[in-house]
A protein has these predicted regions:
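Extracytoplasmic "Venus flytrap"/periplasmic binding protein-like
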Residues: 81, 85-153, 187-190, 195-198, ...
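Glycine-centered hinge/linker elements that transmit conformational signals in sensory
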Residues: 205-208, 251-285
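Short, solvent-exposed loop/beta-turn-alpha elements that line the ligand-binding surface or hinge
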Residues: 137-153, 196-198, 214-216, 222-224, ...
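A structural signal for short loop-to-beta-strand junctions that line the ligand-binding cleft
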Residues: 109-110, 118, 149-186, 221-222, ...
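Hinge/lid segment of periplasmic solute-binding proteins
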Residues: 46-53, 124-178, 204-206, 234-240, ...
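Extracytoplasmic/periplasmic substrate-recognition and gating elements
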Residues: 84, 88-91, 189, 271, ...
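Extracytoplasmic/periplasmic solute-binding protein
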Residues: 163-172, 177, 187, 201-257
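Long, aromatic- and glycine/proline-rich binding clefts that accommodate carbohydrate-like moieties
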Residues: 160, 327-329, 380-438, 442, ...
């Protein structure tokens, strides 16, 4: 989920250049909320039954987002389409707020001064905070009012943003981690390029065949690059069907402490991840995100773990130098890693307000953004999953998957998971991830043992949770 994000394309989708105006249907006006309301409480009262936005002044909405580059262009295309369809009734203005961490920090400050956005795109790490903040108006209020069919959202995607049966935000740009691999390197090593490894244990066993050295004994090609990312720890716990935190993984209540220390999941992942470096399967430089990507693109490592959302940009960067393969996110081993993955990425949040016209306008915009045609367009331009299942039936989506079959792996992995793999919620998740990543890096650099890394993670995260819960007790 990271954060940040996922990530983009040009060559990936020349096939859909003709999709510039995707003419989304069923998005007429109806509207309203005040810019950045600061009401307290988990949810607002039931929204007004109906609001006619075809009369009265145009409703202006401010939309804060964290999309850059190609993603930002695709986003603006969608917004322009919406504004054209609703001219004179609703106008949405997009404002880039930097990466996800920057955006949520700005959001916290702005909402206190009542100068925040009407609609806010935030990463999955911000979910628990935004639910608890009292600033947001749950999507479930509008779903229930309009009897909007929530089943049109992929269940495995909706699960992350659903707590106690209530969908709080609308999934928008969703992704999961994948194993990317160099099929040509597999062939050269005498390995079947259609049978990629499924676990870290298997990757370690294959590493000698994928390793090449120069006359001095230095590795010129290694097996894998997998950076020290807290998301990969979380996903490994999901694959093991073990929670990251107590209190239902942060879903039945605010987490008070981590669970990965006592359930064995943390130790299992740290041992397997550390062994990648210790065995020589992964060069130490490849524990860095940029280095891991560069090494893979340039043939210095044969496998690379990253988000599904980088598929497009990888294809562009590789530019035909080798055939790119995709596989499911690797578990620790085939004995414990029998579960699925949860989604990362971001969702759309509606701010609370007493202005019924603004609330209705926000709801219309959000429905537009997740319509089948809109999500098919968004997928082909960015590489994020379509969150709406009907988007899979759109011609532009089918054409794209046919041209880039690697993306089918991401779809299959998502559908082979289950809502039970929804993932954890934590109001200080960004801080948690930083602690995890710092301690993993120290372990990989031989500054501490696996046991010390696990203890340091546990102690620091539990202390941070205690401080947060004490200062936010209701």
């Amino acid at each position: 989920m990271k954060k940040s994000s996922l990530k983009r394309i040009a060559a990936f989708l020349c096939a859909v250049a003709c999709a510039g105006s995707f003419l989304l249907a069923g998005c007429s006006s109806s509207g309203g909320a005040s810019s950045g309301g600061a009401d307290s409480g988990e949810s607002s009262s039931a929204p007004a039954a109906s609001v006619d936005l075809t009369s009265g002044p145009e409703v202006d909405l401010t939309f804060w987002h964290s999309m850059g580059g190609t993603n930002a262009k695709a986003l603006q295309t969608m917004i322009d389409e919406f504004n054209t369809k609703n001219k004179g009734h609703i106008k949405v203005t997009a404002q880039f707020q930097g990466n996800y961490d920057d955006a949520i920090n700005k959001f916290k400050s702005a909402m206190v001064s009542k100068s925040g956005p009407d609609i806010f795109q935030s990463y999955e790490l911000g979910t628990r905070y935004l639910i608890d903040s009292g600033f947001t108006d749950p999507m479930q209020n509008y779903i229930d009012r309009d009897k909007w069919d929530v089943k049109q959202i992929d269940a495995n995607i909706a699960a992350y943003y659903t707590v106690n049966g209530k969908l709080y935000s609308m999934p928008f740009n969703s992704s999961t981690p994948l194993l990317y691999y160099n099929k040509d390197a597999f062939k050269a090593a005498g390995l079947d390029p259609e049978k990629p490894p499924k676990t870290l244990e298997e990757i370690i066993s294959l590493a000698p065949k994928l390793t090449q050295k120069d006359a001095s004994g230095n590795a010129t090609q290694s097996a894998i690059g997998m950076w020290a990312y807290g998301w990969f720890l979380d996903e490994s716990l999901n694959k093991m069907k073990k929670p990251s935190f107590d209190n239902g993984n942060g879903r039945t209540g605010a987490p008070a402490k981590v669970a990965f220390d006592s359930n064995g999941g943390g130790a299992a992942y740290l041992k397997a991840y550390h062994q990648l470096v210790e065995s020589g399967a992964m060069p130490k430089y490849a524990i860095d995100a940029d280095n891991a990507r560069s090494a893979f693109v340039n043939g210095k490592v044969t496998m690379y773990v990253e988000s599904t959302a980088v598929l497009a940009s990888l294809l562009k960067a590789i530019n035909g130098k080798f055939e790119l393969g995709t596989a499911y996110f690797p578990g620790v081993d085939d004995k414990v890693s029998t579960g699925g993955v949860s989604i990362g990425g971001a969702s759309l949040w509606m701010m609370k307000s007493d202005d019924a016209r603004k609330q209705a306008a926000k709801w219309e915009f959000i429905k537009f953004m997740v319509s089948p045609k809109g999500q098919a367009f968004w997928n082909t331009k960015t590489g994020y999953f379509p969150i709406t299942t009907e988007a899979y039936n759109e011609p532009v989506f089918k054409e794209n998957v046919k041209k880039y079959p690697q993306f089918q792996t991401a779809i299959n992995q998502l559908h082979d998971s289950s809502p039970e793999s929804a993932g954890a919620l934590c109001a200080i998740y960004t801080q948690v991830r930083k602690i995890e990543e710092t301690e993993m890096q120290k372990m990989l650099n031989n500054q501490q043992t696996e046991d010390q890394a696990l203890k340091n993670m546990t102690d620091q995260i539990n202390s941070a949770l205690e401080d947060y819960n004490a200062s936010n007790a209701k």
